Structures are given as C-alpha cells and as structure tokens.
C-alpha cells in the first residue's frame, strides 16, 4: 500500500469513527410519559361535572382526555405534536394509549388514559415511574423501520393529570433507588405540592411543576410545562409559562395563576 492510499484509508476511518461517536447524541430519543386518571363522578371525590365529561369509562368524551382541553384532543390539535399511535391500553386499567411525536425534535409523548375507577392504579404507576421503576418498552412501527421507546420508569419526564385522590385515600409509598439521578415530574392535580410531597420524596423524584391550590388539570398547562422542559428552561421559567397558559384559559388573573403553581421543594 503506497503512502497516499494509506492516508486516504486512515482519513476515512477517522471520519467514520467521528460520526459513530456523534450519532448517539444526534439520534437520542427523549420520552415524556403522562398518566391521566379520567374524571369520574361516581368513583372519585370530585365536584360533579356533566355526566358526559365525568364518565370514567368513556375516554372519548372525558373531561381530561377527549374533551376540548383533554390531553388527547388538545395535543392532537397542536401544531407542535403529531399523533402517531392510538390503541387500547396494555391492561384493563388503561382504556387508551396515545403516542405523539414532537415535529421538530426526537421527542415522544406517551399518554395513558386510566379508567376513572382505577385511579389508585394510575397513581401507583405514576409514582413507580417517578421512582424509576417498572421501565417498559413500546415499539412503534411504520413502513420503513421500528422505533423502540423506553417508557414508564425509563421515561425522561413523568406527569400525572387528574383528581388528587390523596385527598380521599393513601397508598404505600414507593421507594426510588438510591444513587440514581432524580427524575423530573409534573403533577397537575389540586394542591398537589401538599398531598404528593411525601410520596415524591420517597420516590426520589424532582418536582418540576406542581400546584398549591384547587385547579383545573387541563392540557394547556401540561403543554406549556412540557414546552419549557423541551427548551431546557429552568423551573421558574416553566412555572411562569404554565401560569400564563392557565390564566389565558381560566381568566383568574396572572398573579393568582402564578401563585397556583410551584417548582421544586
């Protein structure tokens, strides 16, 4: 092999190794997992809503899923997200699972609609994920390839949307693994900072956004918080964006909305 050929081979190998080293960072996928407990007039201690919105067995019309500001409908109508998967859930507790793809980055949002009467299971699964437990795989297949998402305890951001059932009952705390990085969580439920704090401390999670009073856990607030997380904003910026979104739809005043949300401990 002459010197010129050797140099060309060396440069080709160097370029290949450089690309190989960069590829994981460029192609890494981030996952947001959202646990939605469907509103249920019969099985939850909520202020009753119209029957159609409060039927915990009917996700298509439910206040927190299929209604105008429910998670599925609101994200499906967003210009930032594309619905790529919608099927019945993997267990009887989950009536529907939807996956949304962020249009400009490799980010996926997996949302599970839990039967209203299964709110205890929804909370247990949320806290398990917050603790980094029960990681699962979800395969998304199109005509060209298969993408495997790590969900549950393997998700990068975990959120709960629904009634704060810890006002009604308690469950056994779920302990996170010591030494693991703290997982950011969003809890959109009434007065969640007070009621969820003991559980999230045991789980070893980091509260990115939660609440300090009664509120409507609708999807515009969730989207604002996730948008901030995608943009790598700090907790206070995410809190401000969430408050702006909440005030836009609830007309409660910007200061009142800001006081309704908190970040960190």
Please provide the spans of the model-predicted regions:
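Caspase-like cysteine protease fold
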Residues: 236-265
């Amino acid at each position: 092999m002459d010197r010129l050929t050797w140099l060309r081979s060396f440069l080709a190998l160097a370029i290949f190794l450089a690309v190989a080293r960069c590829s994981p960072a460029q192609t890494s996928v981030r996952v947001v997992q959202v646990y939605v407990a469907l509103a249920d007039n019969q099985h939850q201690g909520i202020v009753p809503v119209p029957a159609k919105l409060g039927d915990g067995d009917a996700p298509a019309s439910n206040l927190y899923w299929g209604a105008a500001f429910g998670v599925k409908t609101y994200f499906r109508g967003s210009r930032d997200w594309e619905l790529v998967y919608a099927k019945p859930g993997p267990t009887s507790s989950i009536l529907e699972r939807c996956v949304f793809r962020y249009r400009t980055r490799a980010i996926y949002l997996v949302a599970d609609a839990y039967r209203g009467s299964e709110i205890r299971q929804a909370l247990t699964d949320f806290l398990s994920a917050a603790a980094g437990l029960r990681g699962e795989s979800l395969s998304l297949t199109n005509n060209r390839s298969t993408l495997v998402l790590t969900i549950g305890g393997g998700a990068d951001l975990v959120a709960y949307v629904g009634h704060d059932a810890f006002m009604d009952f308690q469950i056994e705390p779920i302990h996170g693994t010591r030494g693991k990085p703290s997982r950011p969580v969003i809890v959109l439920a009434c007065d969640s900072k007070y009621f969820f704090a003991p559980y999230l401390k045991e789980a070893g999670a980091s509260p990115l956004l939660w609440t300090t009073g009664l509120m409507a856990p609708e999807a515009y607030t969730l989207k604002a918080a996730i948008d901030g997380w995608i943009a790598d904003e700090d907790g206070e910026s995410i809190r401000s964006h969430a408050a702006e979104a909440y005030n836009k739809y609830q007309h409660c005043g910007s200061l009142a909305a800001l006081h309704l949300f908190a970040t960190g401990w």
